[in-house]
Amino acid sequence: MTSQHQEHTGTKRFSIQSDPVEIHRAIVEDGVAIIEGFLTPEQVQKLNKDVDAPLKADREQLKFKADKKDDPHFWLADFIPDHVARVHNLVDFSHCFRHEILNHELLHKICRLTFEESGDYWLGYGAVIENGPGTTEQKWHRDQPRYPLVKEGPDAPEGMLNFFTALTDFDAETGKTQYILGSNKRVELGEPDADHPIEYVGLKPGDTTIVSGKITHRGSDNRSDKMRRAMPIMIIPSILTPFDATCHLSRELVETMTPLAQKMICRRSVMIPAPGTVEVKTGIWCVNMREAGEQIGLKSNQRAKEDAEATDAV
């Protein structure tokens, strides 16, 4: 007897040297792909050091639980679950994120392929989420929000990519992320079934799962006595508004960054398809109808003040 069920081979795994075209194809087909060793051990160490104090402060502060029964508006900070700490705006305080992650070569190769139809892309947010012992299983969800002006469904252009990067072990005890295989091809959120089984994805520190906004997934319980820590790097088309604001960043800090990293934080103009075509690109987020950075005289690749002082002291 021949089975009528779809066959799923599981989430494809790649290395940092893998062909970005193959990785992109896996994301389109499966809604998820894993890159082992996306970050080096040194980068993982630096990022963990950068977020240790902010996460500790977040855990220690009294969390305000908003009563939203009669208010349709809310802030994410009011809805962080118990046992969870979360810190955003990594560009502000993490040298590694600002200079290494935002210039990650493979990340950009994959994003250029993914968002080719909608034009340039930039950072939606850079965050670290720490799930402590006692963290409970999430509800099934998709990361891509439903905007009335944006086409939805399996055939729609990609509205976001989440480079969900492990900073600690994701295993059977700390909790592997669960994905419903094939759910990126469904319109409805759906539940797992014989044609759409659950896959539990384990990660080592430095591995990343590239998650399409169309794939249904959830976090698992943390049954261990350890923290489970991940860095979601949310990339969105530049026609959408980022979650993390960058207007508060000083010009001095921004000018230490590369032009590419500056564009990722909305300090450079971006190119999108001109009306009625995808072949011709036109600039938006402009000053005087021209490139914003050039118009305001924005410099790049400048030495940070602390780096210059350290060099002068030697």
Curated annotation (Swiss-Prot):
* Enzyme Commission number, as recorded: 1.14.11.-
Keywords for the protein's UniProt record, in alphabetical order = Alkaloid metabolism, Dioxygenase, Iron, Metal-binding, Oxidoreductase
What Pfam families does its record include?
PhyH
Q: Which InterPro entries match?
A: Phytyl_CoA_dOase-like
Name the needed cofactors.
Fe cation
Residues noted as binding Fe cation in the record, renumbered to the chain = 141, 143, 217
A Gene Ontology molecular function term of the record: metal ion binding
**Any GO BP annotation:** indole alkaloid biosynthetic process
User: Under which pathway is this protein filed?
Assistant: Alkaloid biosynthesis; ergot alkaloid biosynthesis
What family does the database annotate? Belongs to the PhyH family.
Name of the protein described by the UniProt record:
Dioxygenase easH
Instruction: List the lineage, top down.
Output: Eukaryota, Fungi, Dikarya, Ascomycota, Pezizomycotina
